[in-house]
A protein has these predicted regions:
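Short, well-structured N-terminal submotif of metal-dependent ribonuclease cores
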Residues: 1-46, 58-68, 140-148
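A general alpha-helix detector
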Residues: 13-14, 53-57, 72, 89
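Short glycine/serine- and small hydrophobic-enriched flexible loop segments
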Residues: 56-60, 111-112
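Short beta-strand scaffold positions
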Residues: 9, 45-46, 101-104, 119
C-alpha cells in the first residue's frame, strides 16, 4: 500500500467547505476533497497561519456567522505544520513569483511535504505553476487518489 497523498488546500478551498452559496465556484470539488480526506484517502495539512486568513475573510464576508463557521473548521482538527517547516521556502516563492507570504505558505508546505497545494485562486496558480506541487481546484479530481490506495 502506498502512502496517502498529502494535500494542502488553501484558504480559497477551505472557505468553500463552510460557505454554502451558489456563487462558490467549484464548491462541489472542494467538498469532494473534504470527503476524501474524511474517508482516509488522503492526508491534509495546513500551515499554522491558516486560521488568521480564514478568520479574516469569514469576519468580513459573514460577520453574523463567522464564529460558527470558524468553529466548524476548527472542529475538523486538521494537522498544522509549524512555521519553521515552511517559512524559508515561502519566502523563496514570494521573491521568485511576487506572491504574498500567506499564499506562498500553503505552497511551500506542499513542496516541503512532497504534496500538492490545491487552490481555487487561478491567478496564484498561473504565477507559480512552474514551481510544481500546485493544482487548481477546478482540475482536481478524487479519481487521482483512488488509484493510490
Amino acid at each position: 500500500m502506498t502512502p496517502h497523498p498529502i494535500l494542502v488546500p488553501d484558504t480559497s478551498v477551505l472557505l468553500k467547505w463552510v460557505l454554502d452559496s451558489e456563487a462558490e465556484e467549484d464548491r462541489d470539488r472542494a467538498l469532494e476533497l473534504r470527503e476524501d480526506w474524511l474517508a482516509g484517502r488522503c492526508e491534509i495539512v495546513l500551515p499554522s497561519l491558516w486560521f488568521f486568513e480564514v478568520g479574516n475573510i469569514l469576519g468580513m464576508k459573514q460577520p453574523a456567522l463567522a464564529k460558527q463557521l470558524m468553529q466548524v473548521l476548527l472542529d475538523y482538527r486538521i494537522d498544522e505544520a509549524p512555521p519553521a517547516e515552511f517559512c524559508r521556502k515561502a519566502l523563496e516563492l514570494m521573491k521568485t513569483y511576487k506572491v504574498t507570504f500567506y499564499d506562498a505558505a500553503y505552497h511551500a508546505l506542499a513542496i516541503t511535504r512532497s504534496g500538492r497545494m490545491i487552490t481555487a485562486d487561478h491567478g496564484y496558480f498561473r504565477k507559480t505553476s512552474r514551481a510544481g506541487h500546485v493544482e487548481v481546484l477546478k482540475n482536481w479530481s478524487s479519481q487521482s487518489l483512488r488509484g493510490r490506495i
